[in-house]
């Protein structure tokens, strides 16, 4: 799920950036620092959308670095248990398949793939129903349900399932 | 809340079905108090109106009943799942089946398939069993390949000898690696030469095997080499195992390979890396293209590159091994009618091996003591009979010196007098070698 929230961060800035462009420098450093990172609480920071407020800088003794408390708006993405996500399959093997939804890595084990889908090996490994009508392979788009999440510093891992109504392939690259 | 507590209690009871029925009755009764039996006792006169009313109530009851039932079912399922889930493996420290967070790291890591993936023994053997059936259905076996000195030879650019520097101008383009065989990998400061015939070898082998790469190199190197050998990713997709993925230091093991040991063949130039799986191993003659590689193994001869030479494309080591693979594969699948699953490729391999020197009766003469046991074992595995005393049945005398008593005897009796390398060559090429190439020269 996406959220638009306000976060706060203390930014350390080197003295060489002081001057007319201080604010711009601060903002670009902020974007570089936080976009693409994860926190367990908020999830993956997709983009900084605006600056709410920059507090008074505090000069550090000895180094000359200045710490600014910055409040910023950003879009974050965090998967929840029970959430339905659409994801792109990145790898299929006998254990199940891996899929990606943006920064989120999702694993759907073969325990959580409907029993009528069977693994087919070969140079394009896939899971196929016995009548061949549904096929999951690399680059397929699937709709899945999250049953477990874990957020690391840089990555989000999820366990997904497609063993439920209305889950499974939504767009098969082979038939397009 | 009530349901929750019941569910939480349920694991305590050994047989939960009776409890569940009682619980279900209780819940259903509680949720539909209006449909009490006294309604049945309504007088006939009011029947018409009541019937309509009843129908309404019933329909409400039904929906109520089914929803509460649904909730119970769900809760029950959840509780059963929690009870039953054996946590067959984990991905990012979560169970791959129930999504529950697991603490403590257990099971075997499968980092080469995906970061953060771990599987437990039972799950691995379950996967192996199911995979085995489909694989045998496709008439395929597993094949684990080593990289260095088996399929290719690499050297650091800094280690190129002066006589090899001409190679720098002959490297093939990295834009289309499928055509070339000599590559300079600038970012890794390396030069790599693929063994002649390797592309046809992989293509042919992929029809008979599901192939893995298993190297003692590190992961980035292994992936880079896999890209050179298999630019389309059709052979080794997510099946590249490096030393970072093994479970034991300085050892290679089949525990990280998702294939049953009885169906795995290994091709490697280093026997002691596979201590536990020697029976699966096809030993490969080392490929030394670069001088640094020769030096590493203590050879003082000129490298193939220095001699501006290379292995033969159509009759080199890989081509010879491919013939052996075809033979083993053919024997495995054509064997009499016993069940495919019960067959063991290790037995097939040793029976093919034991025909190489079949009929040869060998006697050793003055072989260095340290080398004798391994040489004798090798000869016996190849099907030769080894004697200790001279006998008329002897066909070959193996010696390093033509001046020994047994050597004289061999010459006199018109037996073959060959160098121990004759046995080693037969072991590498799975073929009896012409004896005249291994004649011992008289010492002056």
Swiss-Prot record, chain A:
InterPro entries per UniProt: NA-bd_OB-fold, RNA_pol_Rpb7-like_N_sf, Rpb7-like, Rpb7-like_N, S1_domain
GO terms classed as biological process: nuclear-transcribed mRNA catabolic process; positive regulation of nuclear-transcribed mRNA poly(A) tail shortening; positive regulation of translational initiation; transcription initiation at RNA polymerase II promoter
Annotated transmembrane regions: none
Gene Ontology CC terms, in alphabetical order: P-body; RNA polymerase II, core complex
Subcellular location, record wording: Nucleus
Domain of life where this protein originates: Eukaryota
The entry's keywords: DNA-directed RNA polymerase, Nucleus, Transcription
GO molecular function annotation: single-stranded DNA binding; single-stranded RNA binding; translation initiation factor binding
CDD domains per UniProt: RNAP_II_Rpb7_N, S1_RNAPII_Rpb7
Pfam families: S1 (PF00575), SHS2_Rpb7-N (PF03876)
Function comment: DNA-dependent RNA polymerase catalyzes the transcription of DNA into RNA using the four ribonucleoside triphosphates as substrates. Component of RNA polymerase II which synthesizes mRNA precursors and many functional non-coding RNAs. Pol II is the central component of the basal RNA polymerase II transcription machinery. It is composed of mobile elements that move relative to each other. RPB7 is part of a subcomplex with RPB4 that binds to a pocket formed by RPB1, RPB2 and RPB6 at the base of the clamp element.
Subunit-level organization: Component of the RNA polymerase II (Pol II) complex consisting of 12 subunits. RPB4 and RPB7 form a subcomplex that protrudes from the 10-subunit Pol II core complex.
PANTHER family found in the cross-reference section: DNA-DIRECTED RNA POLYMERASE II SUBUNIT RPB7, DNA-DIRECTED RNA POLYMERASE II, III
Family from the record: Belongs to the eukaryotic RPB7/RPC8 RNA polymerase subunit family.
Name under which the protein is recorded: DNA-directed RNA polymerase II subunit RPB7
